[in-house]
C-alpha cells in the first residue's frame, strides 16, 4: 500500500513573533498538547505553526497574518504556510507547482482560533476551528466610566510592556492622526513614560 508523505513548508518569519511570557517552542508544544484555551495565555504577537504526525496546528494573534495553501504532490500533500500570498506563490513556482496556484485557494487563519489540518492524502483542506479567545459578553452596565477605566488600564498595561523593552537611549514613536484612538494611545504612552520616570523628550 502506498504511504503518503506529508510535508509542511513554513515560510513565516520567526523574527516577527514576539512572545513575552513563553518561548516559541513552548508555545508550539502547548498548541499541540493543550486545550485551545492555553493559547489564550500567550502574551505578545505571534503567528505559529506546530506539527505532530499528520496533524498541523496554526494560530495567530490579531496583528499577524497567517495564510496557508495545500499543494498536491504525487508523494503526498504539501502544506505551505506564510504571512503573505506572494510568498506562497513564489514557492510554488520555484517548485514547479505554479499551475496549482490561485489566490482564492489560499486561506487565512482566523485570529483567536486554533486551526487543525489533517494531512491525509490530497483532499481539499477540511480544517477544524477551536476558539481560544472568548471574552465575556454583556459584562458591563451602561455606565461608561468603568468601561473607560478598564479600557485605558488595559491599554496602559500593554504600552508599559512595550516601553520597558525599548532601550533607554532609543526614541519612542506613536502614530498620531489627531483622532480619539491614536490620541488615547499617545496620552497613554505619555502617562506611562511619566510613571516610569522616562525622559519625555524621547516621545
Where do the language-model regions lie?
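Cysteine-centered catalytic environments shared across enzyme families
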Residues: 1-203
Amino acid at each position: 500500500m502506498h504511504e503518503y508523505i506529508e510535508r509542511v513548508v513554513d515560510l513565516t518569519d520567526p523574527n516577527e513573533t514576539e512572545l513575552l511570557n513563553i518561548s516559541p517552542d513552548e508555545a508550539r508544544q502547548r498548541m499541540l498538547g493543550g486545550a485551545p484555551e492555553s493559547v489564550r495565555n500567550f502574551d505578545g504577537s505571534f503567528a505559529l505553526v506546530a506539527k505532530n504526525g499528520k496533524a498541523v496546528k496554526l494560530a495567530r494573534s490579531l496583528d499577524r497574518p497567517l495564510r496557508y495553501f495545500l499543494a498536491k504532490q504525487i508523494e503526498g500533500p504539501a502544506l505551505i504556510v506564510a504571512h503573505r500570498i506572494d510568498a506562497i506563490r513564489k514557492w510554488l513556482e520555484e517548485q514547479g507547482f505554479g499551475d496549482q496556484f490561485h489566490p482564492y485557494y489560499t486561506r487565512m487563519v482566523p485570529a483567536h482560533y486554533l486551526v487543525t489540518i489533517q494531512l491525509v492524502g490530497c483532499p481539499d483542506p477540511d480544517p477544524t476551528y477551536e476558539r481560544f479567545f472568548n471574552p465575556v459578553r454583556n459584562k458591563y452596565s451602561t455606565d461608561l466610566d468603568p468601561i473607560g477605566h478598564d479600557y485605558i488600564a488595559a491599554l496602559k498595561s500593554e504600552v508599559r510592556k512595550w516601553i520597558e523593552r525599548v532601550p533607554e537611549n532609543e526614541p519612542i514613536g506613536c502614530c498620531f492622526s489627531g483622532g480619539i484612538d491614536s490620541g488615547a494611545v499617545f496620552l497613554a504612552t505619555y502617562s506611562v513614560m511619566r510613571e516610569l520616570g522616562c525622559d519625555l523628550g524621547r516621545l
